[in-house]
């Protein structure tokens, strides 16, 4: 979810025994999770005494790695697990671990080492490898995405209250003028799978269906621990018989709707710049209620309007929908939202964002939306050096985000001290 220093994309599971579903309730004698260091790490010295978390349904287990980054787990109940790990290192530690070959992008920022495997079947004794990546912590993160929408008191779908929120993790005011917000390609049948992107673009780009920009001609400072609220309709939606919606009149920016049947816009709220939309008739944020709502933040001095566009894979069409190819190196933060499935949960194979941008995904509980659910970052149990609240950012949205029907804009969980 941050600017990536280096990562190998493959997350592999090495199975050492056959699956035996007939004995699926008997605890396994031995399961091993092995951390695989990023290529620039000179050895495994930073992989010892790290916490591995295994989640399945309503149970969570943890294990500690040995000096070589290997965790042995006894008496593990056979199940389908999400396995993850993450820890922080300083920029000087990163330089030391890489023998000076890896240079952090900013000495002011710490870095996060992380890795994740989703829906890993463990029904027999085996060794599971988790490929690690390293990413630089960012000042500004995506902290809320409200795409689900709701229904009003007449049981009619109410879409107007969708919004995004950003949060400043740093102890300094940050001028976000000129910051870009990208909405990721979200077709029912993917325009490009990650495998397609690997084949044609060597994992170097992300497909965007829309690009917006915070106006660059006016200073726009976010206070330490402050938020930025970006909406489609900056009105008080609670007055429209929509009890699960919010008062958005205090929004910082509004994506103005210029369609023939527009949402109500607020002339008192500044316009978000629209740079590109895959449909000329859609000028506001096209957040899909079904959950295919990947969002990225990126920064560049390049002329974004000149960037290459592509038709769906294998890009042989001459007309139709086109997506902008965003160079991955400019991405500061990214959150993968996927549709939920009642029986299996989100389908990780539908990911649009590389694991080094977001190792997993977040999602609402509902499978179709219209429930007033918002995905939002958890509050960390740590404070900033200046004493303000921090949000969890481990480069893994499955770990970093919660879901709520009641939390309000600019509001986050409080952690007891």
Predicted regions and their residues:
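A short, solvent-exposed beta-strand micro-motif common in secreted/extracellular proteins
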Residues: 77-95
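A structural motif detector for short, solvent-exposed N-terminal "entry" segments of globular domains
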Residues: 133-190, 281-294, 300-318, 381-383, ...
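Bacterial Sec-dependent N-terminal signal peptides
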Residues: 1-42, 130
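Short, acidic Ser/Thr/Gly-rich low-complexity loop/linker segments typical of extracellular
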Residues: 57-71
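Structured interaction patches on ligand/partner-binding surfaces of diverse proteins
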Residues: 89-131
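Short, ordered, surface-exposed loop/turn motifs in non-cytosolic proteins
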Residues: 39-58, 174-178
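Solvent-exposed beta-edge/loop recognition patches
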Residues: 202-406, 416
């Amino acid at each position: 979810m941050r600017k990536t220093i280096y990562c190998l994309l493959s997350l592999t599971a090495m199975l050492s025994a056959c699956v035996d579903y007939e004995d699926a309730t008997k605890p396994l004698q031995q399961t091993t999770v092995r951390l695989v260091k990023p290529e620039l790490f000179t050895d495994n010295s930073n992989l010892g005494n790290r916490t591995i978390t295994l989640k399945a349904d309503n149970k969570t287990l943890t294990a500690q790695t040995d000096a070589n980054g290997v965790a042995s787990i006894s008496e593990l109940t056979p199940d389908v697990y999400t396995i993850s790990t993450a820890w922080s290192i300083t920029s000087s530690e990163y330089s030391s671990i890489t023998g000076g070959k890896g240079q952090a992008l900013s000495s002011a920022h710490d870095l996060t080492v992380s890795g994740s495997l989703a829906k890993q079947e463990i029904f027999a004794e085996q060794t599971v490898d988790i490929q690690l990546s390293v990413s630089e912590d960012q000042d500004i993160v995506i902290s809320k995405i409200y795409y689900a929408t709701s229904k009003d008191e007449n049981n009619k779908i109410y879409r107007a209250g969708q919004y995004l929120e950003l949060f400043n993790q740093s102890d300094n005011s940050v001028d976000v003028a000129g910051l870009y917000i990208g909405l990721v390609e979200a077709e029912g049948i993917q325009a490009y799978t990650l495998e397609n992107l690997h084949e044609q673009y060597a994992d170097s780009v992300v497909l965007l269906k829309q690009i917006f920009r915070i106006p660059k001609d006016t200073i726009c400072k976010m206070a330490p621990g402050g938020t930025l609220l970006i909406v489609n309709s900056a009105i008080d939606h609670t007055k429209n018989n929509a009890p699960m919606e919010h008062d958005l009149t205090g929004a910082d920016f509004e994506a103005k709707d210029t369609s023939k049947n527009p949402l109500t816009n607020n002339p008192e709220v500044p316009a978000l710049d629209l740079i590109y939309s895959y449909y000329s008739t859609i000028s506001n944020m096209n957040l899909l209620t079904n959950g295919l709502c990947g969002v990225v933040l990126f920064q560049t001095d390049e002329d974004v309007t000149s960037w290459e566009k592509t038709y769906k894979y294998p890009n042989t069409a001459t007309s139709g929908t086109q997506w902008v190819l965003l160079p991955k190196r400019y991405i500061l933060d990214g959150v993968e939202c996927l549709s939920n499935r009642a029986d299996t949960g989100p389908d990780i194979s539908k990911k649009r964002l590389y694991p080094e941008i977001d190792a997993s995904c977040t999602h609402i509980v509902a499978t179709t939306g219209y429930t007033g659910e918002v995905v939002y970052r958890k509050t960390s149990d740590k404070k900033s050096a200046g004493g303000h609240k921090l949000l969890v950012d481990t480069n893994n949205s499955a770990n970093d985000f919660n879901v709520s029907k009641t939390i309000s804009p600019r509001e986050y969980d409080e952690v007891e001290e």
